[in-house]
Amino acid sequence: MPSVLIPLCVYLQQRKGQATGLAFIDATSLAVCHNRRIYSHKVFKKIAKRGKTSMGWFYGFKLHLIINERGELLAFRLTPGNVDDRRPVPELTRGLTGKLFGDKGYLSKRLFQTLFEEGLQLITPIRKNMHNRLLPLFDKLLLRKRALIETVNDQLKNISQIEHTRHRSVANFMVNLVAGLIAYTHQPLKPSLNLTNPQQALLNEPL
């Protein structure tokens, strides 16, 4: 493992944003080789796994992210590609309170209850076969803003270049990933929501 990786990880922790009571969660795939080369791929043979997203199958890892409404990174976790998006959530959200918005992949009564007991309300869309529920208008509006974190993931891949298939070692992959996340934290103009003071005050209301 390159000696630079540990200092980079420490620095990345220092670059995390401030919890504001509003957060968005998502997971994005990090493919390490083309699907046709899975069986001949050796670098990540023992740790990468096949996973599936809305775009199809991939071989590699998942990067799980939580951001605030300013586009700042609050938490991150790397897992093999076959890990359920919900599994890392309790650890990722440790210390966070307020509202957490995610897609349908985070639907889970057990997860909702676990987070609610910690002071964090998980808000997701519902499936077509589920009974409709009443949400405050502000929460419905924020639920439609989940694209914010998708934009962050897009910038991480296309600007910070955290995903490519030319890695020669696991250590090189990790350094590239951490350095890319750090580079993103230094972007002066991050994707963000422009909330008014009254809207911000709604986030501070008790659950």
Labelled PLM ranges:
Residues 1-207:
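Short alpha-helical elements
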